[in-house]
């Protein structure tokens, strides 16, 4: 293509994404748009087409990003090229949403006509506004009996401050309003700005590992043109590669000769390691590099940590392979080997949040058929010592001795919880139980309230979301952002079995709730650990102080069975001999902790 052709093509490109809260009908709308633009034959169409992982279909959530190029003949008779970039809606994947929004010029905001605006909708709208996107509100599911589009339209104007007078009323399921949405995209979303003659700048917004072609980077070209055979450089890592293929997704991968300004597609360059294509990095030409990378990218830091151990310790290497393969597609996952006396060899893994952690665990169990034990999730603590040094602790067993600790700081989050009026009391109670500090309360309309709390991340990691959902009958929605570290009275609690510490059961807890947690765990273990030949004390300790104790009684043989009547001194002798033996056993005996005891303690809730 020459310069004029490229410029004409560029004026016809529209890049947009769809943002919505979970379950407001985003993936269905994407399906309808694909149908309307004839991207697929009827035979190839299936529900949630862009959600390619089984797990995504099953949970009905979008985890990885997907991008599609669609051709649309608008009412003005012109052919337009639309790029739809699908985004995940869950709070753990906020960074992935921000990347895919940065690759667009416009966003369709889908709001459920019955439920109205939810917490995550707001969070994503703010991300879109930060990226200066043109936002087109769409009120979806208007065919529901409980739909109230006018109220929702008012809510969009009041809560977000968008003009919703031209909001499209649609039903993705019934296919109503799809054409209006496409027309609005063509009219209102600006064409990409950029110059095809400038040095190349492409933004990576996702990457995928293909066993035959290496890493395939999903890219949006901002300036310049990239062709097969070009030598390109990744600006963050400085690695250089030769491009082997470029192309676009028409959901299927379709090869092209070149990608130019405004194109959204893929690039393969026999890259072996996904760490070389960081999400959010800028690709440029090695010979004629861009002056600076595109703004807005950062390396993701995991927030939540836990240990993953294979139940069958022989499968340690399989687990490593599984984690390495998942890491190829998931730049936010981190792991390092770790050993535990109780659980053997395993890995300490870092995740973006709880959903991310659950998904990784589930994918390992599903795709790689490895049964896992997971230790309790923990966050990163900052520990300041009395000698003026400070250290970072992400694993309770690395916590130093309480005598030398000056103070401990933990990460806090600002949580915005949207909830119907009737449940405000229940939500406040949960937040206070989780050491939350009340900040603010705002009424969205007559029926719904937003509560803002500051809560320690470690409390949210534990079963906050489950409690919130079960106490509000599933109506509450919740979004959080980190606000930094604050000092807290935190202590490390160890569990001793027969005076020996079980490292996998150590955890960090707030001093006020230490006694209760210790007591519950000790009782739980007493039920689950089988009786031994000698008595086994179970103790919960903080430093050298025992806060809770329980004893598993010994099993004993009746040594007096042979003595019918007879002298007391004879019985005494046999009993003393037995006692002596038990004592000796106790000093050398070790106690096996069964698998289910670990599981039970780790799954235990605060109740």
Curated annotation (Swiss-Prot):
Entry's localization field: Cell membrane
Record domain tr-type G: where: 11-193
Xref: PROSITE patterns: G_TR_1, G_TR_2
Gene Ontology BP terms: positive regulation of translation
Membrane topology type: Peripheral membrane protein
GO terms of molecular function: GTP binding; GTPase activity; ribosome binding; translation elongation factor activity
Keywords: Cell membrane, GTP-binding, Hydrolase, Membrane, Nucleotide-binding, Protein biosynthesis
Cellular component terms (Gene Ontology): plasma membrane
SUPFAM superfamilies assigned: EF-G C-terminal domain-like, P-loop containing nucleoside triphosphate hydrolases
Catalytic activity: GTP + H2O = GDP + phosphate + H(+)
InterPro entries per record: EF-4, EFG_III/V, EFG_V-like, EFTu-like_2, G_TR_CS, LepA_C_sf, LepA_CTD, LepA_IV
EC number: 3.6.5.n1
EC supergroup of this enzyme: hydrolase
Binding of GTP, residues: 23-28, 140-143
Pfam families on file: EFG_C, GTP_EFTU, GTP_EFTU_D2, LepA_C
Family recorded in the similarity comment: Belongs to the TRAFAC class translation factor GTPase superfamily. Classic translation factor GTPase family. LepA subfamily.
Known function: Required for accurate and efficient protein synthesis under certain stress conditions. May act as a fidelity factor of the translation reaction, by catalyzing a one-codon backward translocation of tRNAs on improperly translocated ribosomes. Back-translocation proceeds from a post-translocation (POST) complex to a pre-translocation (PRE) complex, thus giving elongation factor G a second chance to translocate the tRNAs correctly. Binds to ribosomes in a GTP-dependent manner.
Family matches, as PANTHER family: TRANSLATION FACTOR GUF1 HOMOLOG, CHLOROPLASTIC, TRANSLATION FACTOR GUF1-RELATED
Protein name: Elongation factor 4
Species, as recorded: Bacillus thuringiensis (strain Al Hakam)
Gene label: lepA
